[in-house]
Amino acid sequence: MVGTMLTMLRPQEGECTLDLYAGAGLFTAALADAVGATGTVVSIEGSPVTHKDARSNFAPDGCSRTENSADTRIEVIRGDVARHLVDLKTALEFGEIPAIDAVVLDPSREGANRTTLERLDALDPKRILYVACDPASLGRDTGILRELGWDMVQLRAFDMYPNTYHVESVALFERAPAKPRPRRRRTK
Protein backbone atom coordinates (compact mmCIF):
# COMPACT_ATOMS: atom_id res chain seq x y z
CA MET A 1 0.00 0.00 0.00
CA VAL A 2 2.81 2.41 0.79
CA GLY A 3 4.35 1.90 -2.64
CA THR A 4 0.98 2.48 -4.29
CA MET A 5 0.48 5.65 -2.26
CA LEU A 6 3.87 7.02 -3.27
CA THR A 7 3.39 6.11 -6.94
CA MET A 8 -0.07 7.64 -7.19
CA LEU A 9 0.36 10.72 -4.96
CA ARG A 10 3.90 11.61 -6.10
CA PRO A 11 5.00 13.59 -3.01
CA GLN A 12 8.02 15.77 -3.80
CA GLU A 13 10.94 17.23 -1.85
CA GLY A 14 9.82 20.33 0.04
CA GLU A 15 6.08 19.72 -0.18
CA CYS A 16 3.59 20.07 2.65
CA THR A 17 1.48 16.93 3.07
CA LEU A 18 -1.32 15.80 5.37
CA ASP A 19 -1.90 12.27 6.63
CA LEU A 20 -5.49 12.18 7.91
CA TYR A 21 -6.71 9.28 10.07
CA ALA A 22 -3.01 8.47 10.25
CA GLY A 23 -2.95 5.71 12.85
CA ALA A 24 0.59 5.05 14.08
CA GLY A 25 2.01 6.68 10.96
CA LEU A 26 2.51 4.12 8.20
CA PHE A 27 1.90 6.70 5.47
CA THR A 28 3.38 9.52 7.57
CA ALA A 29 6.77 7.77 7.54
CA ALA A 30 6.77 7.37 3.76
CA LEU A 31 5.59 10.96 3.23
CA ALA A 32 8.32 12.28 5.53
CA ASP A 33 10.94 10.38 3.54
CA ALA A 34 9.57 11.75 0.27
CA VAL A 35 9.29 15.43 1.29
CA GLY A 36 12.66 15.40 3.07
CA ALA A 37 14.26 18.02 5.28
CA THR A 38 12.56 20.95 3.54
CA GLY A 39 9.09 19.39 3.67
CA THR A 40 6.30 19.19 6.21
CA VAL A 41 3.99 16.34 7.20
CA VAL A 42 0.96 16.91 9.41
CA SER A 43 -0.41 13.66 10.85
CA ILE A 44 -3.85 13.63 12.49
CA GLU A 45 -5.30 10.63 14.34
CA GLY A 46 -8.25 10.34 16.70
CA SER A 47 -7.32 7.19 18.61
CA PRO A 48 -5.31 7.92 21.77
CA VAL A 49 -3.51 4.56 21.52
CA THR A 50 -2.26 4.88 17.95
CA HIS A 51 -1.61 8.60 18.40
CA LYS A 52 0.73 7.76 21.28
CA ASP A 53 2.55 5.30 19.01
CA ALA A 54 2.82 7.93 16.27
CA ARG A 55 4.26 10.50 18.69
CA SER A 56 6.88 7.98 19.72
CA ASN A 57 7.59 6.93 16.13
CA PHE A 58 8.13 10.51 14.95
CA ALA A 59 9.96 11.98 17.93
CA PRO A 60 13.34 13.41 16.85
CA ASP A 61 14.97 10.07 17.72
CA GLY A 62 11.90 7.96 16.82
CA CYS A 63 12.16 4.60 15.11
CA SER A 64 10.27 5.82 12.01
CA ARG A 65 12.73 8.63 11.31
CA THR A 66 15.15 7.79 8.51
CA GLU A 67 18.21 9.64 7.32
CA ASN A 68 16.07 11.41 4.72
CA SER A 69 13.36 12.37 7.24
CA ALA A 70 15.57 13.17 10.24
CA ASP A 71 14.98 16.91 9.79
CA THR A 72 11.50 16.80 8.24
CA ARG A 73 8.96 18.91 10.12
CA ILE A 74 6.42 16.34 11.34
CA GLU A 75 3.43 17.53 13.36
CA VAL A 76 1.56 14.69 15.11
CA ILE A 77 -1.91 15.78 16.26
CA ARG A 78 -4.53 13.82 18.21
CA GLY A 79 -8.20 14.55 17.78
CA ASP A 80 -11.13 14.83 15.44
CA VAL A 81 -9.94 15.29 11.86
CA ALA A 82 -12.78 17.65 10.85
CA ARG A 83 -12.12 19.92 13.83
CA HIS A 84 -8.38 20.03 13.24
CA LEU A 85 -8.89 20.90 9.56
CA VAL A 86 -10.41 24.18 10.80
CA ASP A 87 -7.26 24.76 12.88
CA LEU A 88 -5.10 24.03 9.82
CA LYS A 89 -7.09 26.54 7.77
CA THR A 90 -6.32 29.18 10.41
CA ALA A 91 -2.64 28.15 10.47
CA LEU A 92 -2.53 28.52 6.67
CA GLU A 93 -4.10 31.97 6.83
CA PHE A 94 -1.50 33.10 9.38
CA GLY A 95 1.39 31.56 7.44
CA GLU A 96 2.21 29.07 10.19
CA ILE A 97 2.26 26.20 7.69
CA PRO A 98 2.95 26.25 3.95
CA ALA A 99 0.29 25.66 1.30
CA ILE A 100 -0.84 22.05 1.27
CA ASP A 101 0.29 20.07 -1.73
CA ALA A 102 -0.93 16.54 -1.08
CA VAL A 103 -3.24 14.68 1.30
CA VAL A 104 -3.58 11.04 2.28
CA LEU A 105 -7.11 10.44 3.56
CA ASP A 106 -7.50 6.99 5.16
CA PRO A 107 -10.75 7.01 7.18
CA SER A 108 -12.42 4.08 8.91
CA ARG A 109 -14.94 1.86 7.13
CA GLU A 110 -17.61 4.57 7.50
CA GLY A 111 -15.54 6.87 5.29
CA ALA A 112 -15.11 10.59 5.70
CA ASN A 113 -18.18 12.77 6.03
CA ARG A 114 -19.39 15.82 4.14
CA THR A 115 -18.11 18.23 6.80
CA THR A 116 -14.63 16.71 6.75
CA LEU A 117 -14.48 16.76 2.95
CA GLU A 118 -15.73 20.36 2.76
CA ARG A 119 -13.14 21.48 5.31
CA LEU A 120 -10.42 19.58 3.46
CA ASP A 121 -11.50 21.22 0.20
CA ALA A 122 -11.25 24.64 1.87
CA LEU A 123 -7.52 23.98 2.44
CA ASP A 124 -7.13 23.84 -1.37
CA PRO A 125 -4.67 20.94 -1.64
CA LYS A 126 -3.39 19.99 -5.09
CA ARG A 127 -3.96 16.24 -4.72
CA ILE A 128 -5.98 13.95 -2.46
CA LEU A 129 -5.29 10.23 -2.17
CA TYR A 130 -8.29 8.48 -0.61
CA VAL A 131 -7.64 5.03 0.89
CA ALA A 132 -10.95 3.24 1.45
CA CYS A 133 -11.82 -0.12 2.92
CA ASP A 134 -15.49 0.07 1.90
CA PRO A 135 -16.47 0.65 -1.74
CA ALA A 136 -19.86 2.10 -0.72
CA SER A 137 -18.23 4.75 1.49
CA LEU A 138 -15.76 5.58 -1.27
CA GLY A 139 -18.65 5.93 -3.72
CA ARG A 140 -20.55 8.29 -1.43
CA ASP A 141 -17.46 10.38 -0.68
CA THR A 142 -16.48 10.46 -4.36
CA GLY A 143 -19.87 12.02 -5.07
CA ILE A 144 -19.22 14.70 -2.45
CA LEU A 145 -15.73 15.40 -3.81
CA ARG A 146 -17.18 15.69 -7.34
CA GLU A 147 -19.69 18.26 -6.06
CA LEU A 148 -16.75 20.17 -4.58
CA GLY A 149 -14.92 20.24 -7.92
CA TRP A 150 -12.61 17.21 -7.72
CA ASP A 151 -12.08 14.53 -10.36
CA MET A 152 -11.04 10.96 -9.63
CA VAL A 153 -8.08 10.52 -11.98
CA GLN A 154 -6.83 7.12 -10.89
CA LEU A 155 -8.23 4.14 -8.97
CA ARG A 156 -6.66 0.89 -7.79
CA ALA A 157 -8.35 -1.91 -5.86
CA PHE A 158 -6.74 -4.59 -3.72
CA ASP A 159 -8.29 -7.86 -2.56
CA MET A 160 -6.54 -7.88 0.80
CA TYR A 161 -9.27 -9.99 2.42
CA PRO A 162 -9.79 -12.96 0.05
CA ASN A 163 -13.20 -14.62 0.04
CA THR A 164 -14.89 -11.60 1.63
CA TYR A 165 -16.66 -8.60 0.16
CA HIS A 166 -14.00 -6.28 1.62
CA VAL A 167 -11.90 -4.48 -0.97
CA GLU A 168 -9.19 -1.93 -0.21
CA SER A 169 -9.34 0.90 -2.76
CA VAL A 170 -6.94 3.74 -3.42
CA ALA A 171 -8.29 6.70 -5.40
CA LEU A 172 -6.41 9.80 -6.53
CA PHE A 173 -8.37 13.04 -6.85
CA GLU A 174 -7.24 16.25 -8.51
CA ARG A 175 -9.05 19.53 -9.03
CA ALA A 176 -11.35 19.38 -12.00
CA PRO A 177 -10.38 21.84 -14.72
CA ALA A 178 -12.50 24.95 -14.79
CA LYS A 179 -15.35 24.59 -17.23
CA PRO A 180 -15.58 27.33 -19.84
CA ARG A 181 -18.75 29.33 -19.76
CA PRO A 182 -20.98 28.82 -22.75
CA ARG A 183 -20.98 31.73 -25.15
CA ARG A 184 -24.21 33.54 -25.60
CA ARG A 185 -25.47 33.95 -29.08
CA ARG A 186 -26.33 37.43 -30.08
CA THR A 187 -29.63 37.82 -31.74
CA LYS A 188 -30.36 40.62 -34.15
Describe each model-derived feature in a short phrase.
Residues 1-188:
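Rossmann-like S-adenosyl-L-methionine
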